[in-house]
Amino acid sequence: IRRVASAPNANSLNAHRPPNYPAQSQSQSQSQHQNPPHYSSLLQMKLNSSTSEAFSSVPAFPGQLQRVRSFRRTYSSNSIKVRQVEVGPSSFVKIRMLGKGDVGKVYMVKQKDTDKLFAMKVLSKREMIKRNKIKRALAEQEILATSNHPFIVTLFHSFQSQDYLYFVMEYCMGGEFFRALQLRPGKCLDEEGAKFYAAEVTAALEYLHLQGHIYRDLKPENILLHQSGHIMLTDFDLSKGSSPPGKPGVVKASSPNQPPSINTKSCVNNLRTNSFVGTEEYIAPEVIKGCGHTSAVDWWTLGILIFEMLYGTTPFKGANRNETFSRIMFWEVKFPDQPAPYQNRTLSSSGKSLIRKLLHKDENSRLGSCAGAADVKSHPFFKNVNFALLRHQSPPILPLIHKSNGIDAVNFRRMPPESMSLDLESDDVMVSIHNDHKNNPFEKFSSMTLYHEGD
């Protein structure tokens, strides 16, 4: 069962009475396309924007089933070029539905003039207005339009019609990380596999914080797999941004042989929000208490994610929401035996230490609360991890691709037939809406085409 983010009434938890929870509906949103960028040093990206780094392609893997090569992409100060939108709904042909949520759906589409496959996220304006989710769509576009990172899904086009908002994104043919875990023995990874993906997620969170954003909804359902097996974060509608972000600080290295690190905490220092958002099993204690939260919630969710990757379940899951919240508030994390086939292995002391420090109940004492990602990356658990070269290493999960472009979507669950199919051919782009901004709550949603170096 895929877990959905919600905003329940948490005050009743502290008042010791049954909470009045809103009804839940199943929600899933997936975003995708073919060619991701390669990983380069975040320190050089931020502190020396004139420096370009390019890495060679990930080699093809042997075997009967074909795995697709990635192309070379260069990072530089002009690696994203924004132009007036050059496409519309009728520029694409729907292939199949990949996922759906309460306000929209995600389709695999093919661009007519290039035959390239993309993931098209289509959001209903009517449903967003009805559910008060307009700001979420605007926040997601802001993050996607300004992000350029190998572990964050790439946006190529965004536009709107009279009734819908459109995001045309990277099609990650490896599918949903949640599904990949569910299909593994024990629904989990060994320690080295969990460490690898934890490192990639940490790098992505570091970049988001550097840009002034708090993710706030990290979970396996919001992570996609590129065809090479590397992760791609998606679904940023619950993210919160600081505009402009604070300036990054510098953390001196503990050894003269090591380079300094970036203090990303200073980029989001002024960002504190009281919104009750997140996914039940991943919500941090300070969110439940309703006392406001900061970027520390992202490090809490990282701790929950690492635990789930290792044990196939979350550490504080209860029989119901109220019990789960109570355990989050008052229970200390316990480490059971790993499921088969890893039951004879014991989690290392550094692994337990990392999870305990990430799941500290006090956000001010939690790992990452001082210097952000620099604190997490310097933990002994990641001692042998070269974060700058993650994109060159072989991931623990290698998705099998039957067809080179992934058009058969073998790594996605089969969706039921649509009751009302969206007709892309008859939906026209709204070219100009500025004259009607008083009556159009989506006036700030930008129609744009983004070009990336190497495309």
Place the predicted regions along the sequence by residue.
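A conserved loop-to-beta-strand element in the N-lobe of protein kinase catalytic cores
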Residues: 153, 162-170, 178-179
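Conserved N-lobe ATP-binding subsite of Hanks-type protein kinase domains
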Residues: 105
